[in-house]
């Protein structure tokens, strides 16, 4: 490769906006956390609708893959969305964490796509590398018996030439990626979007709330055909952001499975502990010793705190791992897989893991640092008790501002979060 080409690619890497990082006091930057694949849940979520996936008249190959994953009944959001989505309708959907939104657009896209060599037929955008990786994995799981369908994931942190070569030599039919990398590939004409028939945004409010990311999404959107299906999904979709979403759509079907004020999480026990900053480490050690858990996610507010807390836990012989932006992409994915596969039972992370990423075995979330908003709280604690299973969320409250956020959570979501009792019944948060 020539020197000029190397420089061009270096410029690309510099220009890519790493949306997943929210800089906090310079060196503290946001953290890349990684966790697990949206395992639309083995054993399946049995919702209020008893009809099976067969009622949707999906391709036999999809039904076979669904059966392999252990699903029996669609969740409420799947029951509401899939019948319309597979007909090509535009969809805007808000439903609480863990209700299988990813499977809606994955199954709908695979049902409709007619793979043509050299043409990208579906494009999925999301705001982090880890979520992109996870969504790609879901497409691979459900397209298990559709070998002619090729799926690829593109995000920053990987040399752009690898992505260009893949597009040139083995063009995928479905592309999942972050806006920065997708836009870079499309601007250089390496990625053609002229045949896209399905345009999907996952965690759409996260992308459209950010002005820079919204501009990138809009530019990508304009490169796709006018005649296409647009689907947008999120666990939190404020009334303010909904009109922005609709500007991308034509007469969309709107599905708000949960009233915004009642986004409580199915099967989740929530408590708080009042303590000083200096008492946090001792209390965390006590909790990890006393509680029964399959896997636990501990949320902190910065990369440096994630690294420090992980070091402390490892010194205390806890099986902990942390994932942050100071690592190479390869190292991050390696750790992500280790946690997902259960090799480590404790993940220390920042808010990056708080949105959209699912690991079935996680049944406890600990907010070592209070999140900065009620929305962030919802997304964080939603990592436990996924898909209607049991879970426990414990939040450390160490300041007046922490108390304010806790009050906002209780008022907005109409929940009564009580102080953690001396003894807690394991059966309330451990799946039987």
Curated annotation (Swiss-Prot):
SUPFAM superfamilies: P-loop containing nucleoside triphosphate hydrolases (SSF52540). ATP binds at residues 95-102. It is an enzyme of class 3 (hydrolase). GO terms for cellular component: nucleus. PROSITE patterns: HELICASE_ATP_BIND_1, HELICASE_CTER, Q_MOTIF. A motif (Q motif) lies at residues 51-79. A motif (DEAD box) lies at residues 202-205. One of its GO terms (biological process) is anther development. Residues 82-255 form the Helicase ATP-binding domain. Gene3D superfamilies: P-loop containing nucleotide triphosphate hydrolases. It holds the Pfam family Helicase_C. Residues 283-428 form the Helicase C-terminal domain. One of its GO terms (molecular function) is ATP binding. It is found in: Nucleus. Its main location: nucleus. Residues 3-28 form a coiled coil. It catalyses: ATP + H2O = ADP + phosphate + H(+). The Q motif is unique to and characteristic of the DEAD box family of RNA helicases and controls ATP binding and hydrolysis. ATP-binding RNA helicase involved in pre-mRNA splicing. Required for the export of mRNA out of the nucleus. Required for tapetal programmed cell death (PCD) and degeneration during anther development. Forms dimer with AIP1 and binds the promoter region of the cysteine protease CP1. Can complement the yeast RNA helicase SUB2. Plants silencing AIP1 and AIP2 are male sterile. This is DEAD-box ATP-dependent RNA helicase 15. It comes from Oryza sativa subsp. japonica.
């Amino acid at each position: 490769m020539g020197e000029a080409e190397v420089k061009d690619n270096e410029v690309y890497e510099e220009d890519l906006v790493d949306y997943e990082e929210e800089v906090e006091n310079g060196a503290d930057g946001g953290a890349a956390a990684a966790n697990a694949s949206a395992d639309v849940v083995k054993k399946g979520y049995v919702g209020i609708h008893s009809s099976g996936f067969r009622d949707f008249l999906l391709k036999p190959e999809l039904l076979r893959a669904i059966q392999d994953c252990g699903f029996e009944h669609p969740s409420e959001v799947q029951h509401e969305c899939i019948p319309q989505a597979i007909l090509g309708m535009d969809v805007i959907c808000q439903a609480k964490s863990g209700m299988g939104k990813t499977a809606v657009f994955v199954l709908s896209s695979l049902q409709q796509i007619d793979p043509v060599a050299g043409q990208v037929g579906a494009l999925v955008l999301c705001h982090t590398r880890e979520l992109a990786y996870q969504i790609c994995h879901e497409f691979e799981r459900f397209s298990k018996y559709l070998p002619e369908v090729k799926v690829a994931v593109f995000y920053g942190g990987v040399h752009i030439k690898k992505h260009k070569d893949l597009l040139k030599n083995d063009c995928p039919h479905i592309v999942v990626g972050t806006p920065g990398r997708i836009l870079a590939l499309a601007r250089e004409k390496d990625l053609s979007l002229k045949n896209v028939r399905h345009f999907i945004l996952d965690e759409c409010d996260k992308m459209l709330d950010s002005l820079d990311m919204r501009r990138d999404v809009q530019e990508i959107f304009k490169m796709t055909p006018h005649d296409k299906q647009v689907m947008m999904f999120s666990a939190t979709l404020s009334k303010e952001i909904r009109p922005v979403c609709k500007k991308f759509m034509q007469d969309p079907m709107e599905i708000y499975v949960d009233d915004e004020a009642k986004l409580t999480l199915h099967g989740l026990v929530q408590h708080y502990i009042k303590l000083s900053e200096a008492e946090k480490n001792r209390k965390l050690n006590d909790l990890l010793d006393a509680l029964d858990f399959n896997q636990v996610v501990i949320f902190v507010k910065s990369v440096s705190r994630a690294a420090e807390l992980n070091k402390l836990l490892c010194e205390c012989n806890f099986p902990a791992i942390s994932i942050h932006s100071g690592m190479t992409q390869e190292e991050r994915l390696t750790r992500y897989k280790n946690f997902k596969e259960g090799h480590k039972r404790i993940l220390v992370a920042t808010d990056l893991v708080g949105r959209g990423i699912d690991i079935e075995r996680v049944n406890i979330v600990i907010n070592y640092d209070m999140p900065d908003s009620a929305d962030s709280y919802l997304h964080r604690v939603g990592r436990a008790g996924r898909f209607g299973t049991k879970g426990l969320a414990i939040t450390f409250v160490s300041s007046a501002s922490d108390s304010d956020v806790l009050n906002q959570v209780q008022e907005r979501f109409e929940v009564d979060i009580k102080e953690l009792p001396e003894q807690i019944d394991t059966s309330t948060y451990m799946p039987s």
